UniProtKB/Swiss-Prot annotation:
Induction: Up-regulated by ethanol at both the mRNA and protein levels. Residues 457-464 are annotated as: Linker. One of its GO terms (molecular function) is aldehyde dehydrogenase (NAD+) activity. The active site is at residue 257. Coiled coil: none annotated. This is Aldehyde-alcohol dehydrogenase. Pfam families: ADH_Fe_C, Aldedh, Fe-ADH. The gene is adhE. Residues 13-456 are annotated as: Aldehyde dehydrogenase. Keywords: Iron, Metal-binding, Multifunctional enzyme, NAD, Oxidoreductase, Virulence.
Amino acid sequence: MADKKTVTPEEKKLVAEKHVDELVQKALVALEEMRKLNQEQVDYIVAKASVAALDAHGELALHAFEETGRGVFEDKATKNLFACEHVVNNMRHTKTVGVIEEDDVTGLTLIAEPVGVVCGITPTTNPTSTAIFKSLISLKTRNPIVFAFHPSAQESSAHAARIVRDAAIAAGAPENCVQWITQPSMEATSALMNHEGVATILATGGNAMVKAAYSCGKPALGVGAGNVPAYVEKSANIRQAAHDIVMSKSFDNGMVCASEQAVIIDKEIYDEFVAEFKSYHTYFVNKKEKALLEEFCFGVKANSKNCAGAKLNADIVGKPATWIAEQAGFTVPEGTNILAAECKEVGENEPLTREKLSPVIAVLKSESREDGITKARQMVEFNGLGHSAAIHTADEELTKEFGKAVKAIRVICNSPSTFGGIGDVYNAFLPSLTLGCGSYGRNSVGDNVSAINLLNIKKVGRRRNNMQWMKLPSKTYFERDSIQYLQKCRDVERVMIVTDHAMVELGFLDRIIEQLDLRRNKVVYQIFADVEPDPDITTVNRGTEIMRAFKPDTIIALGGGSPMDAAKVMWLFYEQPEVDFRDLVQKFMDIRKRAFKFPLLGKKTKFIAIPTTSGTGSEVTPFAVISDKANNRKYPIADYSLTPTVAIVDPALVLTVPGFVAADTGMDVLTHATEAYVSQMASDYTDGLALQAIKLVFENLESSVKNADFHSREKMHNASTIAGMAFANAFLGISHSMAHKIGAQFHTIHGRTNAILLPYVIRYNGTRPAKTATWPKYNYYRADEKYQDIARMLGLPASTPEEGVESYAKAVYELGERIGIQMNFRDQGIDEKEWKEHSRELAFLAYEDQCSPANPRLPMVDHMQEIIEDAYYGYKERPGRRK
C-alpha cells in the first residue's frame, strides 16, 4: 500500500487561500444583491433570523458546552438569548438603508451604505452567541459576513451561523449572506483577514488575534483583553456588592471578558464583605493552596523569578472552580462557585491579579480611597487597558473621581461587571458581545460595537447661508440738542467721562456735565481727558485703572473715534479684567465662531457714546482701533459686546469742527458706506443704509467743508452714523486694512488715508477676479455691479459695470480734490524711498488686518503692495492697472 502523501505548508496555504477566495467572491456577489434591499426587507430578514436563533438558543448552548467543555450550559443559553433579544431590540428602529436622516435647517442628509464584506473572528469563550451577534448586525447593515471560527468551537459556531443564514435566506436575503471557513486553520484565517475583497475585520479574541487583525492594512474592529477590577468602597451596599460580584464572576465560569478579575475592598468593611462573599459558596484559598493555584493557572508562584513571563494556562478557561482546585492539587467543598485568593499587591509578582477567564478572583485590601483607586488603576493597566472597571459605592463624587482615574472605556457603577459591560441590562450601554477598548487598548473603537460600526455614513451637504444679523445700540437719539437725554437716562449715579483735551478746551465737556447736573439725582463723575489721536494701549490701561478705582455705573465716551475706541476697550478691561489684549486682536473668518470668545459687557456699566465728529460711526459699531505705538501697530478690535448701549447723535456738537477735519472725516464716512455696500457680508438690511449714507455724502460733504452750515453738518452727522450702522453689520474691506497699517507706520490721518486709497480699491474690487473670496454671502461676484448701482444713483455714466466702476472711482477722487484733500501720499510729507521700503511689509500687515476677510474679492498681498505704491503718486497721476 502506498504511503499517504504529506501536505507541505505551502500546499496547505494554497488550499486555504483558494477556499477563502471562493467564499469572498460569493460574498461580493451577495453584497450587490444586499444593496438592493430596502429597510423594510432588511428589518424583516433580521427579525426572522433572530427568532430562528432564539428558537434554537438552548440547543446551541448545549452544543457549545459539549464541544468546548467550557462554561455553563444555562449561562450560554442566556448569552444566546441576549444576542437575539437585547441586541436586536436595541437596533430595531435604527435606520441602516439609504437616507437615514434629513435636516432641513442644517441642510444635511445622511445616507447609510454597507461597508462591504465582513471578516468575522469569534472566540472559544462565546462561540454561538458571538456568531449570532455578528451575523445579525451584519444582516442589519446589508453586509455579507465570512467567519473564521475558533477551531475548538468550529461545529457549534457553524451551527449557530447556519441557523441564522437559513432563516435569513428564507426571509429574502441572498445566498451566501453568511458563510464560514469549513476547515479552520491559521492559514485560512490569515488569508481571510488579508483578502483584498474583505472590507473590514470584526475580531473578538485574544490580544494576538486582535493585533493580527489590525496589521492587515484595512479597517478592523478589534477589541482587547480585559483585567477588570471591582473596587468596593466602604459606603457601598455590602450585601448587594457581594451578590453582584459572585453572580458576575461565576457566570459561564468567568469566561465573559468583562467579568471581575480582582475585588478591592476597603479595610473598614473587609471582614464583613469577605463573610458575605463566602456565603455565596466562594472558597478562600490558604497560603499553600494559593501557591498551588498560581502554579496551575500560570506556571509560576508569587514573587518568583519568572513571574514576569507568566502565561495563562488555557486549560482553566471556563472550567468549574472545583475542577480547577482538583487539578491544582487541593480540594474544595462541593458546590464551590469561585476560588478567591488574597493578594498583597497588583502586578507581575502576584500572577493571580492577571486576567484569568475562569472562576478565580484575586482579593485585595485597600487602606484608603486613594489606595483603592490606585489598585484599580493598576489592575486596568496590567494588560487590561481600556476595557472595563467596576466600583461599588454610595458616593457619586467618588464614582466620578474613579472614572477619571482609571483608563477604562466602561466604568460600571454598583453593578455586576459581566452584565454591566455588555450593556442594556444594568445600564444604558449599547448591548454588544464585542467591547471596544479605545486608544488605551490600541483599538479603533472605544464603545460597545454595534450595527452602526458596520456602516459607511455618507453626508450630503446642501448649500446654505449662515443666519445673518443686525446688531446695533438698543437706543439711538438724534436731532439737535439730543444730549438732553442725559437728564432722563435711568440709573445714572456714578459717571466716568472718557474724552480728549480738545473736548475740554472747546467746552463740549462742560455741556455734558451741565446735562448731568440737571438730573433730579446727584451725579458723581470722574473725567479722563488724556485720550490722544490713535489711542495707545498704554492710555487704555491708565484709563482702566482709574475706572476700576472709581467704579462707575455709566461710561460716557465724548469726542471723535479715538475717545470712543479707547473707552470701549477700557469698558471691556473694567468689566472683564482677566482678558488678554493679544486675544482681542486675533483675526477671525466668522465673528460668531472666532477662537476667542469676548465676554458679554453691561453687567456693571452702561456705555453712552456721543460723537463730536462726523466720521468714525463708532457710536453704533462693535469696533475699536487701538494702537501699539511701541511696535508701530494698529489693531482693529471687533466684537458685538463692544457695541455701545446708547448712541446720542447731536448735530449741535459738530458745528464748529474745522473744514479740513470735516473733509477728512467725511471721506471716512464715504469709505465706510462704500466698503459696507460691496462687502462679502452685505445684506438687504445694510445695503439701504450704505446707499443712503453715500447719497448724503455726495449731496452734503462739499457744503459741510466749505460753508459749515447747519443743514449740511447735520446731514453729514447722520450719514456718519448711518454708515456706521451699515458697516457694523456688513464690515469693511481692504481700504481700511491698508489705512490702518499706513497710519500706524507713517502717522497719516485716517480719513485722508482712506480718501486716497478708495479710488484704487473701487477699481480693484470692480474687476472680476481670477481668485475669488472663500464662502462669501453673494452667490456670484457682483461688486462691479454694485459699484454700477452707486454710479447710477449718483447720476454718473454707468451703462456697463465697467463704466460704472470707472465713473465712481473718478467721482470719489474728484470729490476729495474739491474739498481740499491732496489725493496722494507724496503730498502728505512722506519720503518716497521710505514709502517703497515699507510697501511690502504694509501689504502683508494689511492682509492680516481684520477688515480684509470681508473684502468682496480675496485680497492678494502683491496686489495690495501695488496699490500702496501707486497711491504714493495719486490716482490722477498713476491710477494703476486693472488687476
